[in-house]
Amino acid sequence: MKKNTIILALLGIMLSLGTLQAQKLYTYPIGVQTYTFRKHFPVKGVEKTLDLIKELGFTEVEGSSNGMGLEEYKKLCDDRGISIPSTGTDFNELIKDPMAVVKRAKTLGSKFVMCPWIPHKKGQFSLADAQKAVEVFNNAGKVLKENGITLCYHDHGFEFQPFEDGTLLDYMIKNTNPQFVSFEMDVLWTMHGGGADMPEKLLKKYPTRFKLMHVKDLRKGVKGDLTGGTPAENDVAVGAGQGNWKQIIKLAKKGGVEHCFIED
């Protein structure tokens, strides 16, 4: 992401909140997903990229150590006043070695670990896939919770396959143990798979299950699907797309979302 695009995203948050900003509705620290800087880290290096993140005003990041040793990366972030409340894992690691996930999170000082993907055949996420995910998340989430870490599943749009009177995402939320498993709402993917008003619907329907949020907007006029993919140009500055940000932030805060991260 280019620097001016990040600034537009920050401005978009403020403009879309309008008078609600003055009422201090948006009280979250300004966070960013380090994936946003995926083109910077290999070229500029970790230290200079973290300098840019600090310069832009971010005080929290979500993500990995970008190839650097965990302790060294944590120190570089600490030196810049940047915390790492959430880091990532993948589905297979949760199955094979949840304690490795715990160790990494604790080294980084992360309270949350998010899993952003469930293996499946593209466009054909099934009940069997959802059932396996529920089992994996409940088992791994228990291990993480026993060690002071909260597992969050990050939705990606493909989970909105119809099921009974709702979707397979509904199935996953209802069948994961809320003591062990929470969720990270990616606003763009939630709209892409479920419709422009789906973020508000989910935050109202499951007000305590979402602990993290990716602040992303979907270009106006884009009709989503269930593939979990869309061209990069459909990711637009917050407030310029389909999201009703006043309502989303209001419901997020009311429901207990603890950290928000801009991502592009």
Across the structure, where does each feature detected by a protein language model lie?
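Active-site acidic/histidine proton-transfer and metal-coordination neighborhood
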Residues: 59-60, 91-182
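Acidic/histidine-rich catalytic cores of soluble enzymes
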Residues: 146-242
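Acidic-and-aromatic substrate-binding clefts and catalytic sites of carbohydrate-active enzymes
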Residues: 38-43, 60-72, 89-97, 120-124, ...
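N-terminal pre-domain/capping segments
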Residues: 21-112, 182
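Generic structural signal for well-ordered alpha-helices
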Residues: 49-50, 70-74, 98-102, 134-141, ...
